[in-house]
Amino acid sequence: MKVWMAILISILCWQSSAWAVCPAWSPARAQEEISRLQQQIKQWDDDYWKEGKSEVEDGVYDQLSARLTQWQRCFGNETRDVMMPPLNGAVMHPVAHTGVRKMADKNALSLWMRERSDLWVQPKVDGVAVTLVYRDGKLNKAISRGNGLKGEDWTQKVRLISAVPQTVSGPLANSTLQGEIFLKRKGHIQQQMGGINARAKVAGLMMRQGNSDTLNSLAVFVWAWPDGPHLMTDRLKDLATAGFTLTQTYTRAVKNADEVAHVRNEWWKAKLPFVTDGVVVRAAKEPESRHWLPGQAEWLVAWKYQPVAQVAEVKAIQFAVGKSGKISVVASLAPVMLDDKKIQRVNIGSVRRWQEWDIAPGDQILVSLAGQGIPRIDDVVWRGAERTKPTPPENRFNSLTCYFASDVCQEQFISRLVWLGSKQVLGLDGIGEAGWRALHQTHRFEHIFSWLLLTPEQLQNTPGIAKSKSAQLWHQFNLARQQPFTRWVMAMGIPLTRAALNASDERSWSQLLFSKEQFWQQLPGTGSGRARQVIEWKENAQIKKLGSWLAAQQITGFEP
């Protein structure tokens, strides 16, 4: 009983974390938003079940359906069953499809497994569920899952799928099987290829009118044999003998959640003959089939893979000014998990790119991880009914602005500080954007090098800077004085690569100021355009003023 309570608490905690933040909508706004999304999902359902086509990726559909359920719970609306098909002309299942409960994580699975024995793991094949009924050794009927109790008659379609045995013998001669009709794949690696909208493709082929040779691109994975042999090994052997070989190949005995996690990770990265979206753990001991009911299976659970892409709600649109003066747009998100990373922000790009995406707070966007784990936007999957977009700042900044602090220069000024403190420039370890903001807010820097004048006492008394860290920071600031001349010039934003600057062999400020355009133009990777930028940079009044200030501080290379 205690274990069951622990499982319940785990599930409730997971659900509450997922549903904790409800939109701050008025009742009228909530009704409008829920109604719009409800209508869209109904349209997708109609397309899926009546036309056999899908206008939306499976993963997006699943996540937006979950979002609708969340909103309905937030505002006391009646929830809907996901993908409930029409029941016109439906056929009763000899044995009900129970569905499978999802485990939130490995801990929840471990609690579930603790009170059970003789457990087995199978891939959660991504396709469309079906009942296969054999009578007197022949395929008698095939029924779509439907609502679990009734489904559509798919017999004629399934008879055209060559991978489904049409005749069986022995224990299966009079049997009812449940499984997944799937799209045959050769070497499908889930980690790399994702879901490829497999479920919708299978549904499309099965719902399409007329017989089609394309049905031979389908096969079946049997995952249940109600009232079959008591021993799982016997069950698997008989299924394999009858032609359902995949079940035996991809069913493994497991003792604990660690073993399940190992197999789950293996199948996530392995070449498989089908698309999967997780694993199913099931007990060999099952109740008699007459007790099977939709939503009431306690002998099996699923542990799904984390989606390659997540639907995230945009909470705010923010603008940032980089050190070069370019304005970039960032979307703040309701947190989502991707590959064990908590994603709360995603870079949209330029203002123009943001306007092309047409993203506003309240919209739902599809986010995935690009190279090196950087979040990216794949699509805008849902736009809110009421959309208010912020006004971007005026484009008054460029590569020669904001070396000196001012109210309008706040963001570019901070970006310059972050840049000069980076490893490739002055290498000021232990301070990032938050630290620079704290220092500037307290000590009101005049320009980007004002931090050189801070005393140990000032650093120690800076709110937001730990006292234990202030001495280390002062030491870093003093060490910066010993950095080579070229590093300081880079900190000043000279429009050259480090390689070009090193090739110039410039070792003093006075030498640099007297160098002509032709000199800069001959440097590797520079060219006439970049050379003119260097001339414009070194003749800028703010740059000259900074050079004089560094000379007064006796920084190497700037002395008269």
Swiss-Prot record:
GO terms for molecular function: DNA ligase (NAD+) activity. The keyword Chloroplast does not apply. InterPro entries: DNA_ligase_AS, DNA_ligase_B, DNA_ligase_CS, DNAligase_adenylation, DNAligase_N, NA-bd_OB-fold, NAD_dep_DNA_ligaseB, NAD_DNA_ligase_OB. It holds the Pfam family DNA_ligase_aden. It catalyses: NAD(+) + (deoxyribonucleotide)n-3'-hydroxyl + 5'-phospho-(deoxyribonucleotide)m = (deoxyribonucleotide)n+m + AMP + beta-nicotinamide D-nucleotide. Its EC number is 6.5.1.2. Belongs to the NAD-dependent DNA ligase family. LigB subfamily. PANTHER family: DNA LIGASE, DNA LIGASE B. Catalyzes the formation of phosphodiester linkages between 5'-phosphoryl and 3'-hydroxyl groups in double-stranded DNA using NAD as a coenzyme and as the energy source for the reaction. This is DNA ligase B. The lineage of its organism: Bacteria, Pseudomonadati, Pseudomonadota, Gammaproteobacteria, Enterobacterales. The gene is ligB.
